[in-house]
């Protein structure tokens, strides 16, 4: 399957004079302290560090909130900052008028009381939000850029629907994890267009909620390889009790495993002696022949990381940082890409990366539930051209 034909990504460059702030709407599940709504929209309202300082050239003019828990912040923030708190998504985009009155939309379907399915997916209303946003654009005859927090779907059928709708509308569309642009320890990456001989990914926490972060972080490194990205041919999910067997079979590169485990705060013996029953050992078989194990190790690993051996023989391992100060800064770097898209009309980097990893995770969760069967993924042969995009701290928040 080729790329989905959404508006092409462009890399940002340079510094410049202060631009006019673009008005944006936001559609969120909940708005409470330290929610994704807070750590993204709060940076529009209060600056990159959420301390009243400089921030993006965006203005939040309207907000739709789907659920109002006791700890809701949106009502008081609307009074303080003057944005419109809306009863419908259409109102958020039109400000109650007869036209699209904003230049961009942030859709944040994360947190809140929503059901789970039998595959362990938390069914946030990301498709419903996206459908109502794009229905409103169609109704009023104007398309503006949309950012979807985390992965589309989360079910693959819904992610595919969203991709097709974006293609039909020629919608500038971004999605994905803040961890792809976060700080790394150590600060290392695969050189642009370097070949990859082997790789290992490590994740922690829930298979759905943090599996997507793990897969997308790994993908933002692997997409840089010399073959470009041609997509995924098959996936399989095994129990963590099979990790020792996978090592014996050569499915996991031994040195890379040790490097990746050390980078994420654990070690081989801790994992092999007591593999977490609520984890999983994922295998991702790429179209170009690369097969990558991704081990989800809740209670063992202390973070998300990867170890890579490139075709020169160089080995490196890195862990993504999830800093809390100054107020979850990786979300500032995510917001920087969103700001770029809203000002240029072009995604800062390809949505296909997130779409691919969303599909990989969905199929892996199915494999895990259905007796660990290997799944041929003809629908994940998603080819795309990556962007040589920076991550913290190499991305300038004051760049225009």
Where are these regions (language model features)?
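Short beta-strand segments enriched in small/hydrophobic residues
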Residues: 21-30, 198-201
């Amino acid at each position: 399957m080729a790329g989905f034909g959404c508006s092409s990504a462009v890399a940002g460059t340079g510094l410049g004079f202060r631009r006019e702030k673009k008005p944006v709407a936001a559609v969120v599940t909940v708005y409470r302290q330290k929610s994704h709504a807070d750590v993204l929209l709060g940076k529009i309202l209060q600056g990159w560090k959420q301390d009243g300082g400089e921030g993006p050239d965006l203005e939040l003019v309207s907000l739709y909130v789907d659920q109002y828990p006791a700890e809701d912040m949106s009502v008081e923030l609307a009074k303080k900052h003057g944005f419109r708190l809306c009863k419908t998504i259409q109102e958020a985009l039109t400000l109650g008028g007869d036209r699209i009155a904003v230049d961009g939309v942030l859709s944040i379907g994360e947190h809140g009381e929503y059901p789970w399915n039998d595959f362990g997916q938390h069914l946030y209303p990301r498709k419903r939000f996206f459908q109502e946003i794009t229905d409103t654009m169609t109704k009023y005859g104007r398309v503006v850029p949309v950012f979807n927090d985390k992965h589309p779907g989360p079910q693959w059928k819904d992610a595919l629907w969203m991709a097709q709708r974006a293609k039909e509308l020629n919608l500038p569309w971004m999605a994905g994890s803040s961890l792809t642009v976060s700080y790394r320890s150590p600060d290392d990456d695969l050189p642009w267009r370097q070949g990859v001989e082997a790789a290992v990914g490590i994740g922690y926490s829930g298979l759905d909620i943090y599996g997507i972060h793990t897969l997308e972080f790994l993908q933002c490194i692997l997409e840089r390889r010399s073959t470009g990205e041609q997509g995924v041919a098959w996936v399989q999910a095994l129990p963590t009790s099979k990790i020792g067997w996978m090592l014996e079979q050569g499915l996991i590169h031994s040195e890379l495993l040790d490097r990746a485990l050390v980078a994420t705060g654990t070690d081989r013996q801790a994992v092999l002696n007591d593999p977490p029953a609520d984890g999983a050992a994922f295998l991702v078989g790429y179209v170009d022949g690369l097969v990558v194990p991704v081990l989800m190790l809740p209670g063992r690993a202390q973070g998300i990381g990867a170890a890579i051996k490139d075709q020169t023989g160089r080995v490196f391992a890195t862990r993504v940082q999830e800093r809390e100060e100054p107020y979850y800064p990786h979300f500032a770097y995510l917001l920087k890409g969103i700001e770029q898209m809203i000002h240029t009309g072009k995604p800062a980097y390809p949505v296909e990366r997130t779409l691919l990893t969303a599909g990989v995770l969905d199929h892996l969760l199915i494999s895990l539930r259905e007796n660990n069967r290997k799944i041929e993924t003809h629908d994940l042969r998603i080819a795309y051209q990556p962007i040589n995009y920076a991550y913290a701290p190499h991305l300038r928040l004051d760049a225009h």
